[in-house]
Amino acid sequence: MITKRIIPCLDVRNGRVVKGTNFEGIKDVADPVEMARRYNAAGADELVVYDITASFEGRALFTEILTKVASEIFIPLTVGGGINTLEDFDRVLKCGADKVSVNSGALKNPNLIPAAAQRYGNQCVVLSADVKRVDGQFRVFAKGGREDTGRDALDWIAWAVDHGAGEVCLNSIDTDGVRNGFDLEMLDAVASRVSVPIIASGGAGKKEDFLELFGHKGIDAGLAAGIFHQKLLTIRELKEYLNKNGVEMRL
């Protein structure tokens, strides 16, 4: 049995970790290096860090922070945000990232996925998809969930995996920050189309949500931010609960 993963996520803007709901209303939470250190010690299986600053100055500051984060943790690190070219892959991998997450950059230039997979290997390329229901269809959104691309999300995700994405991080905009459980309907739809690991993101509110999530076929990891940042649930407590309930975890 493959062990399931618990992954905290840090959204970094102007050098600080921030958190919003349904991709809106961003609030300052903490220092990223301090937080990364805390999650590493708390038993997180991986850490995801997103650069949500679009400016050039912000990017330089983020690169500096990323290098510090990578030197402080001993778990796999996935980095995303502003990844538009192979040079961007180089930049974050040199900082110490293990995997690189592509989103809007790949929607703009789909060839980025096969090019990156060829250069770094599929295991290094994570497709991050921000998905929302529009007129009964799962649509993929760009620009941090602000722009409807009009594309069918399931077709886009399947294409990306066929062309080299080794993992999918599915962010449901509909359940993001709402803490009412993961978007299982959306996750099942994606799992029926791809066979690579899927990370579920958006909606975690309590430990039972993770237990329900891992009862669904094809879901390898649960990603959350708010509930961990605000210490409503510790990773240790969550993993012990899941383990006790028959979910294979690395304790």
Give each language-model segment a name.
Residues V12-N14, V18-K19, A97-L170, D174-T175:
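Conserved anion-binding
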Residues D11, Y39, L47, V79, ...:
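Conserved, mostly hydrophobic/aromatic
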Residues T53, L61-Y120:
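Glycine/small-residue-rich loop that forms an oxyanion/phosphate-binding "nest" at active or ligand-binding sites
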Residues I73, L77-G96, E185-A221:
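Catalytic cores of alpha/beta
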Residues R5-C9, E46, F74-T78, K99-S101, ...:
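Structural preference for beta-strand elements that scaffold enzyme active sites
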Residues E46-I65, S104, C169-N180:
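Glycine-rich, proline-tolerant flexible connector loops at the mouths of alpha/beta enzymes
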Residues R91-L112, S172-G177, A200-D209, K217-R236:
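Glycine-rich phosphate-binding active-site loops on the catalytic face of alpha/beta enzymes
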